[in-house]
Structures are given as structure tokens and as C-alpha cells.
């Protein structure tokens, strides 16, 4: 199945701003060499929050391998949706509950490999912990401490739209955990059901197969345009991609070729959560709410559409938002907040800043 490359060249030119060449990784998994050329293999780590046995991650892994990449999977043993960037490690040396869908039995080691593919690993922890297990244990101990060129997380079984869900999602959490380690990363999210890969359809119109191809097309284009650079993406920057309803889950039945466009997280469609009390059950549930803060544009290109609006209303388009792990407020807004704290809070003496020369 051929996928459209509309907007993909733009992805490389806009998101691949010049990397700070003075930065170099200090451990084996931080990116500390140039992006490989065509005559050498690119190493990609795949992770997610829906478990190592989900149809989405297995289809993505297989598709990346078809392209000739050197691919490893380090993913949670069990479903870990909604864990954000939390870092939960195994409490025992064995699996108390087994792995998702019985893909590893109760009592199996808390981390282990697929019996048919030693590049596929599960880990009894959250997504951020699982990908770090790859960086700090599995790759150094069993795979010659190979340098990772890119981490891809997902595709998630559910959209991750807007700034609130960005902090909540385990898929996004694995992405920004990797970015903070100096490893370029992309989070992918779709909207299909939790499906065991062994029971998944092989049809070309199956959503997991379309998501795998669409995600791989974005990865392939990005790596092609990044050849010879110090890093696939600028340090501290990641991509958050949301894929629309496609194939067998698309009500129109027409979307098999989602077209990627640039978006931002905040905007007119962006939402956050609120509590809603149910008088019948006496319990709370969550609902959606918009605020001035979800619409605010403080960083980035304010003329881009927001990802929530694009995915909910634009049809067969994928949203690609460029995100940063530098959470400090922009200079003018930071100065205003600092001014409002005058009289008590002081600035550090000259020479105590975070960057050379401060």
C-alpha cells in the first residue's frame, strides 16, 4: 500500500532545525554520532504503553524491520495506559500477574525476551521505565551497547490530544523520557481497540496495519532528511503524532492514506479535564472543558491548527506537533511572573546560572 508523502518533506525542513553541535551524549544510549547513511543500519527502539503484545506495536515493529532498520522492542509486560512519565520498576524478580493476554505466564521473569526474536523484550514496569531498561541494561548487556538513533513509542490505542493528555499518556511519557536522555523520539497515537497481536487481522485495511505503514512513512522520511546530522531531531525536542480513524475503524471507509500536517497542542480545540458528579451512582467521572489556558499560544507557531481540532474535524489527516522538554516559560512571561514575586524572591548571583557565561 502506497502512502502519500504530502507534508512529509516539510516535516524534515521545519522540525529538523539545526542541532546544537556542542552537545554530546555521555552514555551509550544518548545519541553521540551522526545519523547513519544508507550503507549502515539505523537502530530504532520501539516502545508503547499498551504492552509488548499489542497488535499496534507488533505491526509497527514488523514494518520497520521490512525497511531494513535494526529494531529493538522494550515495552511493558502489561497495559500501562495513563501512567505518563512515571518510573515504576519491578517489585519482584517474577511476574505476579503474567504478561498481557497471557503472553508470558505468571511466575515468568520480570523481564525477558520473545522466544522467537531476541530483539523483542518485555519489562514489568511503566513505559518510561521499560525504554530505560533498554538503554541501561538490555542493550549494554546483551546487544553490544549499540547506539540508539531513534525511539518510537506506540502507536497508542487511543488518541493523545492536547497538553493535558500529553502529560498523562504513557506513550508520550516514554517519548519525553527518551528525549531527556538525549535520544530523539516520536510518540504515535491512533484510536483503535486493545488487540492481541496473535489474534489480529492480516488485512491491509486493518487499522493496526495502516497505522504501522503511516508511522513508518514518517520515520523513513525523517531519517532520510536527517542523514549526516548530529541527531535525528534537535536535542530536547520530540514529535507527537496522532493518526485519524482509518481502514476498518473509519466510518466512511475511505481513509487508508492519512496525510500528515503540522499542528500544535494548544488552540481552539484543545481541552483539559473536569470532574462530573453522577447523582445516580454517587461517584465522579471525568469530562472535558476548555479554558483560556488551553487556547493560549506561548511557544511555537501560533498560526498552526491545533491537533485536537485536526483529528476531530479534518478527516483523513494525521497531526504532527513538535514538542519540547524545556518547560520554562518564554522570557517575557517569565519576567512578568518574576516581577509579581518581587520583594521576596531574588535572582541568583552572577555566575550561578545553568549555562556557561551566566
From Swiss-Prot:
Keywords of this entry: Glycoprotein, Hydrolase, Magnesium, Metal-binding, Secreted, Signal
One Pfam assignment: SurE
Enzyme active site: 189
EC category name: hydrolase
Residues the record lists as binding Mg(2+): 49-50, 81, 156
Glycan-linked positions: 20, 27, 32, 92, 145, 199, 278
Signal peptide range: 1-17
Enzyme Commission numbers on file: 3.1.3.2
Catalytic activity as recorded in UniProt: a phosphate monoester + H2O = an alcohol + phosphate
Described purpose of this protein according to its UniProt entry: Probably serves to scavenge phosphorus for growing cells.
Name of protein: Acid phosphatase
Gene that specifies this protein: PHO2
Amino acid at each position: 500500500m502506497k502512502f502519500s508523502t504530502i507534508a512529509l518533506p516539510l516535516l524534515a525542513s521545519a522540525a529538523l532545525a539545526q542541532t546544537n553541535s556542542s552537545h554530546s551524549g555521555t552514555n551509550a544510549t544518548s545519541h553521540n554520532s551522526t545519523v547513519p547513511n544508507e550503507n549502515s543500519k539505523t537502530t530504532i527502539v520501539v516502545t508503547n504503553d499498551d504492552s509488548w503484545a499489542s497488535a499496534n506495536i507488533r505491526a509497527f515493529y514488523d514494518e520497520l524491520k521490512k525497511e531494513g532498520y535494526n529494531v529493538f522492542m522494550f515495552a511493558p509486560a502489561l497495559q500501562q495506559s495513563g501512567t505518563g512519565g512515571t518510573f515504576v520498576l519491578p517489585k519482584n524478580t517474577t511476574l505476579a500477574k503474567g504478561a498481557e493476554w497471557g503472553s508470558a505466564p505468571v511466575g515468568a521473569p520480570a523481564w525477558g525476551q520473545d522466544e522467537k526474536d531476541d530483539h523483542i523484550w518485555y519489562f514489568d514496569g511503566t513505559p518510561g521505565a521499560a525504554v530505560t531498561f533498554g538503554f541501561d541494561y538490555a542493550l549494554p548487556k546483551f546487544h553490544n551497547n549499540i547506539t540508539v538513533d531513534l525511539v518510537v513509542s506506540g502507536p497508542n490505542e487511543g488518541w493523545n490530544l492536547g497538553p493535558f493528555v500529553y502529560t498523562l499518556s504513557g506513550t508520550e511519557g516514554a517519548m519525553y523520557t527518551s528525549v531527556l536522555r538525549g535520544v530523539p523520539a516520536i510518540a504515535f497515537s491512533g484510536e483503535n481497540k486493545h488487540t492481541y497481536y496473535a489474534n489480529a487481522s492480516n488485512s491491509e485495511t486493518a487499522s493496526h496495519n495502516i497505522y504501522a505503514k503511516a508511522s513508518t512513512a514518517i520515520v523513513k522520511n525523517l531519517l532520510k532528511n536527517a542523514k549526516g546530522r548530529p541527531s535525528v531531531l534537535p536535542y530536547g525536542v520530540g514529535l507527537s503524532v496522532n493518526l485519524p480513524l482509518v481502514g476498518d475503524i473509519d466510518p466512511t471507509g475511505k481513509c487508508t492514506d492519512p496525510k500528515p500536517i503540522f499542528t500544535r497542542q494548544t488552540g481552539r480545540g484543545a481541552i483539559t479535564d473536569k470532574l462530573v458528579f453522577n447523582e445516580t451512582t454517587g461517584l465522579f467521572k471525568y469530562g472535558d472543558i476548555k479554558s483560556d489556558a488551553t487556547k493560549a499560544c506561548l511557544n511555537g507557531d501560533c498560526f498552526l491548527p491545533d491537533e485536537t481540532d485536526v483529528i476531530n474535524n479534518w478527516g483523513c489527516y494525521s497531526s504532527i506537533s513538535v514538542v519540547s522538554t524545556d518547560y520554562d516559560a518564554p522570557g517575557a512571561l517569565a519576567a512578568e511572573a518574576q516581577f509579581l514575586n518581587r520583594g521576596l524572591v531574588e535572582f541568583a548571583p552572577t555566575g550561578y546560572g545553568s549555562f556557561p557565561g551566566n
